[in-house]
Amino acid sequence: MAQAGPTPQQAIARLRAEIEQHNIRYYVHDDPSVPDAEYDALMRDLQALEAEHPELVTPDSPTQRVGAAPLAEFGSVRHAVPMLSLGNAFDEEDVRAFDKRVADTLRGAGLLGLDQQVEYFCELKLDGLAISLRYEEGRLAQAATRGDGQTGEDVTANIRTIKGVPLRLHGAPRVLEVRGEVLMNRAEFERLNRTQAARGEKVFVNPRNAAAGSLRQLDPRITAQRPLRFFAYSWGEVHGLPEGMPTRFDEPAPGVRVASTLPRDTHGGMLDWLAELGLPVNLRHNHRERGADGLLAFYERIGKLRADLPYDIDGVVYKVDALPSQRVLGFVARAPRFALAHKFPAEEAVTQLLGIEVQVGRTGAITPVARLAPVFVGGVTVTNATLHNEDEIRRKDVRIGDTVIVRRAGDVIPEVVGPVLEKRPADAREFVMLTACPICGSAIERPESEAIARCTGGLFCAAQRKQTLLHAAGRKALDIEGLGEKLIDQLVDADRVKSLADIYSLTAFELAALERMGKKSAENLVAAIDQARRPALGRLLFALGIRHVGETTARDVARHFGSMERIMDASEEALLAVPDVGGVVAGSIRRFFAEPHNREIVEQLTQQGVHPQAEAEPEGTSLAGKTFVLTGTMPNWTRDEATRRILAAGGKVSGSVSKKTAYLVTGEDAGSKLTKAQELGVPVLDEDGLKALLGL
């Protein structure tokens, strides 16, 4: 009797297992085991069988990566274990200081001998989007972005479309949360941009931007078409190890044994274990090193390889390898004490300076901008770069037609470093500052002793008007949600809005007719404008955009005078009576309100029903008059929230540390302000310390 063939269920299980193994060979080991055509044939066979037997289709089948129906919006996901960021190092001194802190702490805990060096696990710092994958009973249950570290966006449907992300793990704990990076290889990025351009669609500025934009598509079918990759580099919640796996014990201190929920006792060992489960782990360039010298050698070695890697990195990461030692070192603010990101310096490139144009800012500041032949630097294609001001152009001797060195300062703002003089052409031309504004034709003047030239057109100048309106609508001023740059451009270009007061006369009907504005958006914007008719007096004063008058100064002046009328009529002597207001600020306020047009705008605001509310007097506390400086990112409060609470308690907030500073409040990436505070003996608080000082 002939032996019966496999049942449909058995055939489907065999095909799935075979495809999963090929995926592991390809994405985890970077070692394809079959040609693409054979892999595609297996997928077609599986798709055909599942089409014949739809009752056998399960969510973890390789065929289910094609993408689900579009979403209306992303849901929120609360991370069971916060996704922390890392402290940064930018030079050798930072790395040596980190290694010393770690070694001193571990020696104090009896985990490191006096003649021993700390062993670190060194990894590449991938330049993509941080993601958390949650597996339950071995199946991918949820995927979320990092978000603010506490709460991210649910991108499960999109993550499922990435072929390198296993939908099922064999031998995994009951719950396993995997952290990693979604990115796009440079070659795939360039191919995607060519396709986008051929279709007349938006091109992306760099691989990270492309990866983030692809992952955050509301339609997973679009994400499925994008060449995304995933690499695991850490873990979050882990519990319920598989049966048969022995319990491992850690020794966080001599003579102390603690049962661990993890199967390995080193960071590198855990990454090996994740790879054994079938997760893609970027192990090729990872390495163990001892002490600061070893870390710096790794940094130098990877720096030389950086340009040859298929993907972008922006540094390397050092982690104490022993997990018991990590536990002893613990955390500070939003970063672990046992890990450090060592950033690469800003990248430089050479290109041609095609021309110099000027931009007009909110206060009329004229900024020269270099127009460049496109050049890829610091991870993006750069065509414009700042030249700061006329004096800088003269100092650097930059001329139109020069071959110039371009640097992405801080990896954000491109700047021209200087010319390559040996390549200067004979017809290179010196820059001549304009005498009239290119936008409104008003005279350009450069006040004595200032480096910045300015357009004298004021709000007559459309460029200044746009920037002034954008400033006024901002969160620290009138906080008009929905009134952004593109909308302001349309309103000013159409001559519908000539001053701040005109904003308050906008109707939902006319707003709905604008580009990218529907009826609902228009109604929401009108509602936001209505809410801004009773702002705090300080906010309205700040919204007017008076030069040298910042948020804190505006609030102090408002609190001192109590009404806009009294501020407008105040003499320079009266303004100087406001604490911390000097001659420059007092003179600027007087000149602003001496201009009839500016007083007219305030009157028009009143006619539109804008009635500022007096600033509340601060509660009488011991903080009255004390100056605080904020630096870094706090775990829970934004800088605006911390500022608001300090001001409400009668304190002041400054942007720089001095002998007059009462407290420095630090968060993640505190930087040079912390160093200066320590030099001056200024007390340093973290967020909890600030809350305690405020009695919260």
From Swiss-Prot:
Q: Report whether Metal-binding shows up as a keyword of the record.
A: yes
Substrates-to-products reaction catalysed: NAD(+) + (deoxyribonucleotide)n-3'-hydroxyl + 5'-phospho-(deoxyribonucleotide)m = (deoxyribonucleotide)n+m + AMP + beta-nicotinamide D-nucleotide
Q: Where is the active site?
A: 125 (n6-amp-lysine intermediate)
Q: Which PANTHER family match?
A: CHROMOSOME TRANSMISSION FIDELITY FACTOR 18, DNA LIGASE
* Main function: DNA ligase that catalyzes the formation of phosphodiester linkages between 5'-phosphoryl and 3'-hydroxyl groups in double-stranded DNA using NAD as a coenzyme and as the energy source for the reaction. It is essential for DNA replication and repair of damaged DNA.
Q: Does the keyword Metal-binding apply?
A: yes
Q: Where does NAD(+) bind?
A: 36-40, 85-86, 123, 146, 181, 319, 343
Where does this protein hold Zn(2+)?
A: 437, 440, 455, 461
Q: Which CDD domains match?
A: BRCT_DNA_ligase_like (cd17748), LIGANc (cd00114)
Recorded protein name is: DNA ligase
Q: Biological process GO annotation list?
A: DNA repair; DNA replication
Q: Which residues form the BRCT domain?
A: 618-696
Member of which family?
Belongs to the NAD-dependent DNA ligase family. LigA subfamily.
**Could you say which cofactors this protein requires?**
Mg(2+); Mn(2+)
| Key words, A-Z | DNA damage, DNA repair, DNA replication, Ligase, Magnesium, Manganese, Metal-binding, NAD, Zinc
GO molecular function terms attached to this record: DNA binding; DNA ligase (NAD+) activity; metal ion binding
EC number(s) in its UniProt entry?
6.5.1.2
Write the gene name: ligA
Coiled-coil segments: none
- Gene3D superfamilies found in the cross-reference section: 5' to 3' exonuclease, C-terminal subdomain, 6.20.10.30, BRCT domain, DNA ligase/mRNA capping enzyme, Helix hairpin bin, Nucleic acid-binding proteins
* Enzyme class (EC, first level): ligase
GO CC, sorted alphabetically, is: cytosol
Lineage here is: Bacteria, Pseudomonadati, Pseudomonadota, Betaproteobacteria, Burkholderiales
Q: Which Pfam families match?
A: BRCT (PF00533), DNA_ligase_aden (PF01653), DNA_ligase_OB (PF03120), DNA_ligase_ZBD (PF03119), HHH_2 (PF12826), HHH_5 (PF14520), Nlig-Ia (PF22745)
